[in-house]
């Protein structure tokens, strides 16, 4: 029975992936940060692990546990993440650092910790990026930058892990039904205040936080499509799944930069001078 470690399984994409892989016959190690989410996963029959993806010692202990119990790891899905929304200068370096700690640094930290067990099984690393890493939008600069970094790291890891027969897949989801927009909206509201120079544009900021739920693909469909890709004899390097996952990168590549930015500024209320 193949073994899959999936991070960030409390809801949305992560939970759908855990359900789908479990139903396909995988032993699923599903991680979550909060104790109540771990309890819910355990109640659903998962091997649930309470894990902060930036906790190095905990990652090392989990890798050793996987080695002892299963002898290796077939699939690692780096899914844990969130979207920091709002003007870059309102959030500043601190907000950017928090975003990168979860969305970027943890990808390297988790993969590094799991390298020994991935090597034993000649496993597959699946990094969940986003079309936001290809098409950059205002009021999501930190999130877009973090996902662009995940894409670059995936390419580097693919080449560096090839000698060990470990494969790396990059996933660029479009709009997927989840709690992402709700959480992103909460992040934005924490930054919004009347002293911000961008206060008059607050509705545009809120609109960007909700944009990921524009005609979203069900998370279960996303998970089923990703499972098919993972189970291929030669898993693809890049997988795009969900509403907008193909059209938006195409727009980013074909439209002149100035025209694209003008359209995005208009959509999110940045057309007028302040």
Model regions and ranges:
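C-terminal beta-strand-loop-alpha-helix "lid" module of Rossmann-like NAD(P)-dependent dehydrogenases
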Residues: 162-213
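Conserved glycine-rich cofactor-binding loop
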Residues: 10-11
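Substrate-binding pocket helix/loop in short-chain dehydrogenase/reductase
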Residues: 87-88, 92-97
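Residue(s) in the substrate-gating loop at a strand-loop-helix junction
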Residues: 130
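The beta1-alpha1 cofactor-binding region of Rossmann-like NAD(H)/NADP(H)-dependent oxidoreductases
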Residues: 51-61, 93
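Active-site helix of classical SDR
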Residues: 111, 146-149
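Active-site loop immediately N-terminal to the catalytic Tyr-X3-Lys motif
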Residues: 88-89, 135-142
């Amino acid at each position: 029975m193949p073994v899959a470690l999936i991070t960030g399984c409390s809801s949305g994409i992560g939970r759908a992936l855990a359900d789908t892989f479990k139903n396909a016959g995988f032993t699923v190690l599903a991680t979550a940060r909060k104790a109540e989410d771990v309890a819910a996963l355990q109640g659903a029959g998962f091997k649930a692990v309470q894990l902060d993806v930036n906790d190095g010692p905990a990652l090392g202990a989990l890798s050793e546990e996987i080695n002892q119990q299963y002898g290796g790891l077939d699939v690692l899905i780096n899914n844990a993440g969130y979207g920091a929304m709002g003007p870059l200068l309102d959030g500043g370096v601190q907000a950017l650092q928090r975003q990168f700690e979860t969305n970027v640094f943890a990808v390297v930290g988790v993969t590094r910790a799991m390298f020994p067990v991935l090597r034993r099984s000649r496993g597959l690393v699946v990094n969940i990026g986003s079309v936001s890493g290809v098409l950059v939008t205002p009021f999501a600069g930190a999130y877009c930058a973090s996902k662009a970094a995940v894409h670059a790291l995936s390419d580097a890891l693919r080449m560096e892990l090839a000698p060990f027969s470990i494969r790396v897949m990059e996933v660029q989801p479009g709009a997927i039904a989840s709690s992402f927009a709700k959480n992103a909206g909460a992040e934005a509201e924490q930054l919004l205040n009347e002293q911000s120079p961008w206060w008059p544009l607050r509705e545009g900021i809120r609109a960007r936080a909700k944009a990921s739920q524009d005609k979203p693909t069900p998370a279960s469909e996303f998970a089923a499509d990703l499972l098919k890709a993972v189970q291929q004899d030669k898993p693809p390097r890049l997988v795009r799944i969900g509403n907008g996952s193909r059209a938006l990168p195409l727009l980013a590549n074909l439209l002149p930069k100035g025209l694209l930015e003008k359209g995005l500024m208009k959509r999110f209320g940045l057309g007028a001078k302040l």
